[in-house]
Amino acid sequence: MAKDKDVRPIIKLKSTAGTGYTYVTRKNRRNDPDRMVLKKYDPRIRKHVEFREER
């Protein structure tokens, strides 16, 4: 049974390029309490762009 306050929740990372492309990953709430921002590859525009955590 999953808890609401899980230590490692599943999050979606959405492209800031506006393509709607997403990555799904997990994060540790204790180490990263703020919203995650990662630079990853967006295959729709064939570039590396920032992906931001959406809730």
From Swiss-Prot:
UniProt GO BP: translation
Cited InterPro entries: Ribosomal_bL33, Ribosomal_bL33_CS, Ribosomal_bL33_sf, Ribosomal_zn-bd
Organism superkingdom: Bacteria
Originating organism: Arthrobacter sp. (strain FB24)
Keywords: Ribonucleoprotein, Ribosomal protein
A GO MF label: structural constituent of ribosome
Disulfide links within the chain: none
HAMAP family linked: Ribosomal_bL33
One Pfam match: Ribosomal_L33
One GO CC term, this protein: cytosolic large ribosomal subunit
Protein's name according to its UniProt entry: Large ribosomal subunit protein bL33
SUPFAM superfamilies: Zn-binding ribosomal proteins
Assigned protein family: Belongs to the bacterial ribosomal protein bL33 family.
